[in-house]
């Protein structure tokens, strides 16, 4: 009887082990049968209520916050005043305190062709208390405006934290649906990882920068209250020599600051931050990244210095995906992949998020680092040290969805669907995180795709049969 019980236990254990292996390493790629209408999304009109200018002759608008330092206890608060600079002061205070502190913003404007921006304010507030809610007030008199944000807990290996994932948003009716869907999600993130392509102002004649203003007012309802971590996409380049605009990224870099100097970067377009139990590296696909370039040297040093015992979850944000099975934009990220995939495997990056492709896709854990020009080893293979690659360029922009997919579905593709939506990454502890993707047409609590992630660093530290999944 005892031997039978032992045999039964062994069989059950073996089944669990095999199923666990299949969860992460099977090549049963799935293409969703859900079909969304193929009509191109329409941009919302200028008189849409989501673009409404706040009352008052010079009220702050387009308010947004992002992380302000490397450690996580700083913020950059930004806003625009349309007529004159107005007050540069930010008043801020903890939730349970009456006394207020204040900080001063810098102010700048820029010109783009025949457009002149409003007065753009950026205020860095540093050395705030971890795990604390802060209120802040900008403007003056009866036209001042009040918002709040949360400083995350201090970094540690088992600090739970939830990130929202949005990319290629634009300002269409579908964009509004994506943002509303994210806001109403019961598990809404505490910060958003934004993987590039913000306003799509470059789709208008002469890159009409008024559409940067409408976009800033549109997303204010979220980004004024929780930090969005910015990645620059191709629609932020705004390089138009024909009309005399030869400074790449001019509107983006004037409007959206990043804490790049805190991580030793020389450019706002690539940088890193720590937030709770995550270490996030933002890369620029549209800046030089070849060997010996500043971005290359910075990333090489950056990956070597990540302390995975403090921040075990290593996340990379890029705009152009390394792996995609959609026909449009196919292999546009190939040179970046060839350059850096071996590093991502070596340093056990957990997940790479990208946009650019206007659809959703999740990869298996694969790598293609054995290839050279003569050996012919050009197929991606299963690799337990490799990250999962998730493309989430499905925010709703006016270019529409990409529905033409490679057939048959490549083995590296685990799930794909041409729909608009958003993602959530829920970090549970040092070993486990849960990713889910919600299409706009689902109920708020319904995930169209989901996967448990086992941390690559801790998996390597504890190689037992149970760790196989």
UniProtKB/Swiss-Prot annotation:
InterPro entries: Calcineurin-like_PHP_ApaH (IPR004843), FN3_dom (IPR003961), Metallo-depent_PP-like (IPR029052), MPP_PAP (IPR041792), PPA-like (IPR039331), Purple_acid_Pase-like_N (IPR008963), Purple_acid_Pase_N (IPR015914), Purple_acid_PPase_C_dom (IPR025733). It catalyses: a phosphate monoester + H2O = an alcohol + phosphate. The active site is at 329 (proton donor). Gene3D superfamilies: 3.60.21.10, Purple acid phosphatase-like, N-terminal. One of its GO terms (molecular function) is acid phosphatase activity. Substrate binds at residues 234, 356-358. CDD domains: FN3, MPP_PAPs. Glycans are attached at residues 114, 176, 307, 429. It is an enzyme of class 3 (hydrolase). Fe cation binds at residues 168, 197, 200, 358. Residues 1-28 form the signal peptide. Zn(2+) binds at residues 197, 234, 319, 356. Pfam families: Metallophos (PF00149), Metallophos_C (PF14008), Pur_ac_phosph_N (PF16656). The keyword Kinase does not apply. The keyword Metal-binding applies. Induction: Slightly by phosphate deprivation. Keywords: Disulfide bond, Glycoprotein, Hydrolase, Iron, Metal-binding, Secreted, Signal, Zinc. Its cofactor is Fe cation; Zn(2+). Expressed in roots, stems, leaves, flowers and siliques. Its main location: secreted. GO terms for cellular component: extracellular region. It is found in: Secreted. Its EC number is 3.1.3.2. Belongs to the metallophosphoesterase superfamily. Purple acid phosphatase family. Homodimer; disulfide-linked. This is Fe(3+)-Zn(2+) purple acid phosphatase 12. The gene is PAP12.
């Amino acid at each position: 009887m005892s031997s039978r019980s032992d045999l039964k236990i062994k069989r059950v254990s073996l089944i669990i082990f095999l199923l666990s292996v299949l969860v992460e390493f099977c090549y049963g790629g799935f293409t969703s049968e859900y079909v969304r209408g193929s009509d191109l999304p329409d941009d919302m009109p200028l008189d849409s209520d989501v673009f409404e200018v706040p009352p008052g002759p010079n009220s702050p608008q387009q308010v947004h916050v992002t992380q302000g330092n490397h450690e996580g206890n700083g913020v950059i608060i930004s806003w625009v005043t349309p007529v004159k600079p107005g007050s540069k002061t930010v008043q801020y205070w903890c939730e349970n305190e009456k006394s207020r502190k204040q900080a001063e913003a810098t102010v700048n404007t820029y010109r783009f062709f025949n457009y002149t921006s409003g007065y753009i304010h950026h205020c860095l507030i540093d050395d705030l208390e971890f795990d604390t809610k802060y209120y802040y007030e900008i403007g003056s008199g009866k036209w001042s405006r009040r918002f709040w944000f949360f400083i995350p807990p201090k970094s540690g290996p088992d600090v739970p934290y939830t990130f929202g994932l949005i990319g290629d948003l634009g300002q269409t009716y579908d964009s509004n649906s994506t943002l509303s869907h994210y806001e109403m999600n019961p598990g809404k993130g505490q910060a958003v990882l934004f993987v590039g392509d913000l306003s799509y102002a470059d789709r208008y004649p002469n890159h009409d920068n008024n559409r940067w203003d409408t976009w800033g007012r549109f997303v204010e309802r979220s980004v004024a209250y929780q930090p969005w971590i910015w990645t620059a996409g191709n629609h932020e380049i705004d390089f138009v020599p024909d009309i005399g605009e030869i400074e790449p990224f001019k509107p983006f870099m004037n409007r959206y600051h990043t804490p790049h100097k805190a991580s030793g970067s020389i450019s706002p377009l690539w940088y890193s931050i720590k937030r709770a139990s995550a270490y996030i590296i933002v890369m620029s696909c549209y800046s030089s990244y070849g060997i010996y370039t500043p971005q290359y040297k910075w990333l090489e040093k950056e990956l070597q210095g990540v302390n995975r015992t403090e921040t075990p979850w290593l996340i990379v944000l890029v705009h152009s995906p390394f792996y995609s099975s959609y026909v449009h934009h196919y292999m546009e990220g190939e040179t970046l992949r060839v350059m850096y995939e071996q590093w991502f495997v070596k340093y056990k990056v957990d997940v790479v998020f990208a946009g650019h492709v206007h659809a959703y896709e999740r990869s298996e854990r694969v790598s293609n680092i054995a290839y050279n020009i003569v050996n012919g080893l050009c197929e991606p293979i299963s690799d337990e040290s490799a990250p999962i690659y998730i493309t989430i360029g499905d925010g709703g922009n006016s270019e529409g969805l990409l529905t033409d997919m490679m057939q048959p579905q490549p083995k590296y593709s685990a799930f794909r669907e041409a729909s608009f939506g958003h993602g959530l990454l829920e970090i549970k502890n040092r070993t486990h995180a849960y990713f889910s993707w919600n299409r706009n047409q689902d109920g708020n609590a319904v995930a169209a795709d989901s996967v448990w992630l086992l941390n690559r660093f801790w998996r390597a530290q504890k190689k037992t049969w149970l760790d196989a999944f």
